[in-house]
């Protein structure tokens, strides 16, 4: 008898946090339990590399997505199709805001879980929390800095099932130091500092400062994760550039210290695997990275500054370069080291995915009653809170939609790329003779990093033989045609179409047909 099927849905965060937590849980589920992923994150290729079926759907802020209203309608239809085809026993959402298309479609799933991390900014909007009761259960991944949590979720822990901090790997999965050094191309046995501050304009200067300071130090090797130096024009010669290293924690035995941002993943991996670090918090709308960094420094497990512009970075790097200082931090880390909550979360989720035993209305794990999706009822207070959020944001929403309608670029050219590599896709993009933001790419490939970085909007159709196509049943050509119809729904007519790989002529004709005729051809 086949085991339960669980669909993990993640939002488009600023890093890999949402996806990594979901994969950490999925890889510890019973082997009879099937995991599927739907994500709005461009890190979808990582999910595939880890062996999980994944379907990427572009987020509302992506090029060619159109207005929020058009995106929401299109996303609702796509999610509904994915859920109907997969027929999961349980849906797990990891993100800050459960978006409307998800809420509209997850009613079809027997049980739903919001994986909702804590440590929100004290002033963060509480509007997302008014949607908590629309889920059957809340899972809260623990935070090492939980005692410093002054955000809005800190008073709502009684509604959540909390587990220890979730990290991707277990101790036994880390490479021994010699093996890690060899795979990364590092000089064996030399003290090594890792720099992984992420990317973006706010961190470029801080990254450059860190690399310059560390590269001048005698007897120390400096390694920078790929994202940390992307966009930098001047990388010191002594810095080792690390590429394709996910999960980075697999190589942590090679490092004696680190300079790191303080997102959930990086922070808890450093703490869990006892890496003395200088934490540089980034400003985020919800995640209180500053609180994490300050707490870690206050209990002696790390060094911290206030942010990427902090003038004390060089001084703190001097402390990090001190072997005795690192040794003291490592001892403290070993003393306070938290458990990995991924396995406990997996067992809890598996229990939710199984229907209650006959005669019971609840599971033994203490979650709310589970219905068939149609029986969920929100409390009057929660419905009133959501209604108030809706009413008070009407003027802002109308203004935003009007601005989007007037200013957002509309795609004029579509590239259909099936069975094509990225070189062929780039060639088609160059032949388009249109600004990249006016080109919509529809492809069965996720190896399109350069295309994404060029600013081209992309949508994904699972390839032949992939699990999503199998679950849909029937002929693959029909599956692909339906997916293309959902992707193009509500979009204006496209003037031209280019192809890469093997694309049937009827798809090209349908893609460039007037919207009404296009809908009939692709339905």
Residue ranges with predicted function:
Residues 266-315:
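Catalytic binding pocket for nucleotide-activated donors in carbohydrate/polymer assembly enzymes
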Residues 315, 321-404, 521:
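C-terminal amphipathic helix plus adjacent low-complexity
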Residues 79-97, 488-503:
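Short N-terminal targeting/anchoring amphipathic segment
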Residues 9-21, 46, 202-203, 416-427:
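A short, glycine/small-residue-rich beta-strand->loop->alpha-helix junction that serves as a flexible
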Residues 253-266, 275:
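Acidic donor-binding loop of glycosyltransferase active sites
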Residues 178-257:
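Donor-nucleotide binding loops and adjacent catalytic segments primarily
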Residues 121-124, 131-192, 197-199, 390-398:
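A nucleotide-sugar donor-handling region in carbohydrate enzymes
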Residues 2-14, 28-81, 306, 452-471:
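Conserved nucleotide-sugar phosphate-binding/catalytic loop shared by glycosyltransferases and other
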